[in-house]
Amino acid sequence: MAVCNCFLQAPPLSRILLPVLSRRATTLSAGYGRLKSTVTFCSTVNRTSPLTSSVRAEVKRVSRKDDKVASATDVQFETPLKIVEYPDPILRAKNKRIDIFDENLKNLVDAMFDVMYKTDGIGLSAPQVGLNVQLMVFNPAGEPGEGKEIVLVNPKIKKYSDKLVPFDEGCLSFPGIYAEVVRPQSVKIDARDITGERFSISLSRLPARIFQHEYDHLEGVLFFDRMTDQVLDSIREELEALEKKYEEKTGLPSPERVEARQKRKAGVGFGKR
């Protein structure tokens, strides 16, 4: 799998991309478990300084004041959870804010980690398992018992870095597809943990990229929305194959088609720099 030249001298882990990652742990700062919040969280993997991208993008400012609140029914689930694949409309639907922090939510988080590990992922959002609520889980190590398991409820980006980094990404909702996406190198986030406690964290490098990928899912944005036309062309046939697979499985026309896509000016960051 090819990566951009600015990472050719990076350690092996930094060349392996999200959210399908080999099972190798990254050293992470701070003790951050499923139930404990903290103020900092960043990868300590050393790598060469990435080049500042010349890609221009519109800043998308997100306000969630009008977000609907999820009911208990919205967070009900059955195990085993199944990964929702493109172009299922669930991936584009609006996701509701979670206000109930109970045992069911903890069980959902456990189930999400289970399916994430079983599918060799390092990050997963609730809409990817058919639940349109603002919840994500990730572990840069991609292995139970290694790294740190992170749970973010109702996350919101407050600041992002000016430096943009191109990096190949994959997605569990797009099996076997990898392509370059440009994102900010670091972000500052406000969120709630699994107990409902509010906190702020700063993420950089790989954890920041995983977070931004999953945050996009909570906004109904898919990773190919952020690709240049040239990059998108390199995976167009694979996306069309997923559209055909959806039609054959459901008997319904695909809710969206990459061939009809107009270049989308999705923001590379949110909130204030």
From Swiss-Prot:
Fe cation binds at C171, H213, H217. Inhibited by actinonin. One of its GO terms (molecular function) is metal ion binding. Its main location: plastid. SUPFAM superfamilies: Peptide deformylase. GO terms for biological process: translation. Disruption phenotype: Albino. This is Peptide deformylase 1B, chloroplastic/mitochondrial. It comes from Arabidopsis thaliana. The gene is PDF1B.
